């Protein structure tokens, strides 16, 4: 049981480190953090950033390699992300008309990043 707790703690810390790394990358590129780990009724969004008028919803995936990280984002999770984003946008002045996109940030076991901008639509 202790090994499971230890692995869970390791995974949690690795996920936090991945989010921190991705956030630094976005900030370096001029984005401003709006919310981190935003949670609505429909689910959680890892990072919400803004560049000008555009809102960027970022899902961070960390694994041994980029392929495994990418494969861990399934259709059900994408549907939850869409629903959570719609919930967040409902509070924006322009609502669903707010310019936005979904990015997926892949982080491999060595900490390298690969950002897939506009990874999937929002319809």
From Swiss-Prot:
A Pfam family annotated for this UniProt entry: UPF0102
Listed SUPFAM superfamilies: Restriction endonuclease-like (SSF52980)
Alphabetized GO MF terms: nucleic acid binding
Classification via Gene3D superfamilies: 3.40.1350.10
Similarity section: Belongs to the UPF0102 family.
Protein name per the record: UPF0102 protein SPO0400
Organism the protein comes from: Ruegeria pomeroyi (strain ATCC 700808 / DSM 15171 / DSS-3)
């Amino acid at each position: 049981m202790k090994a499971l707790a230890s692995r869970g703690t390791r995974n949690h810390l690795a996920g936090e480190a991945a989010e921190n790394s991705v956030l630094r990358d976005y900030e370096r590129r001029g984005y401003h953090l709006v919310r981190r780990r935003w949670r609505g009724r429909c689910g959680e969004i890892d990072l919400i950033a803004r560049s000008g008028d555009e809102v960027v919803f970022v899902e961070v995936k960390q694994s041994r390699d980029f392929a495994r990280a990418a494969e861990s984002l399934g259709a059900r999770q994408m549907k939850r992300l869409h629903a959570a984003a719609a919930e967040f946008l409902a509070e924006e002045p322009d609502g669903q008309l707010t310019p936005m996109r979904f990015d997926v940030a892949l982080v491999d076991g060595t900490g390298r990043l690969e950002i897939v901008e506009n990874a999937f639509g929002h319809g």
